[in-house]
């Protein structure tokens, strides 16, 4: 389909160095883009995809380690062309550690200002729910004790206390889109709902048309392309020293 070039961010050194190491070792040569979702992202980096047949369910392979999250948000976010690390879900990965090898490139979609406003409210509501749940978990022994003695008044008072604390905590750091995010999401597009949750450590600087070709292929079960889309080779281009 063609070539594309990625630039890696110095502010995410562990992800940068790991990606360079794997590329230089030939780790990515022959791996498939095993998960492709139009207007969302294209994902690769599962080493088991090199030898997988057409019926294999992919996405679990890795080099045997994870990387600590390196969020540089809001400076780096999920605009079109962003390179980010895949990872397992929060329920099993509360630290949001990254896969040691799997990555995705954002394709996304363009949003209107009104759509971003709606999304900001939804994200805010989600964060409030997370704060409330965290408070409840911290006081679970008290909650269970009140439930055991059927202390409904106490439970209701505790709930109101949690609601007030939730509102205060959220008000101290509400979710807002930066001007850079708004400009990007309303022009070139992206996937704003992933911001601050996955490590963004680079971006496509050349050959985005190739990413577009990949995102438009026909896919089947588990969003895997019907016809394999393979990384033939990956090489590292180091900037010339001045």
Predicted regions mapped to residue ranges:
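Cyclophilin-like peptidyl-prolyl cis-trans isomerases
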Residues: 1-242
């Amino acid at each position: 389909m063609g070539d594309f070039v990625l630039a890696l961010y110095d502010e995410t050194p562990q992800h940068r160095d790991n990606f360079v190491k794997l590329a230089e070792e030939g780790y990515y040569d022959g791996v498939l883009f095993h998960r492709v979702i139009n207007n969302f992202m294209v994902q690769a980096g599962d080493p088991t995809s090199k030898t997988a047949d057409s019926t294999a369910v992919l996405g679990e392979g890795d080099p045997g380690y994870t990387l600590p999250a390196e969020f540089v948000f809001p400076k780096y976010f999920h605009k079109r062309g962003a390179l980010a690390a895949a990872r397992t879900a929060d329920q099993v990965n509360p630290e949001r550690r990254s896969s040691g090898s799997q990555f995705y490139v954002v394709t996304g979609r363009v949003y209107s200002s009104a759509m971003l406003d709606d999304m900001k409210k939804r994200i805010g509501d989600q964060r409030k729910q997370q704060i409330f749940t965290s408070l409840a978990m911290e006081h679970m022994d008290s909650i269970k004790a009140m439930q055991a003695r059927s202390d409904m008044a106490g439970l209701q008072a505790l709930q109101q206390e949690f609601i007030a604390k939730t509102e205060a905590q959220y008000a101290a750091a509400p979710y807002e889109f930066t001007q850079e995010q708004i400009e990007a999401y309303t022009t070139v597009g992206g996937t704003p709902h992933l911001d601050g949750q996955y490590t963004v450590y680079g971006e496509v600087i050349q050959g985005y048309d190739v990413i577009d070709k990949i995102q438009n292929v026909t896919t089947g079960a588990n969003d895997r392309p019907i016809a394999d889309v393979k990384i033939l080779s990956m090489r590292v281009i180091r900037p010339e020293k001045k």
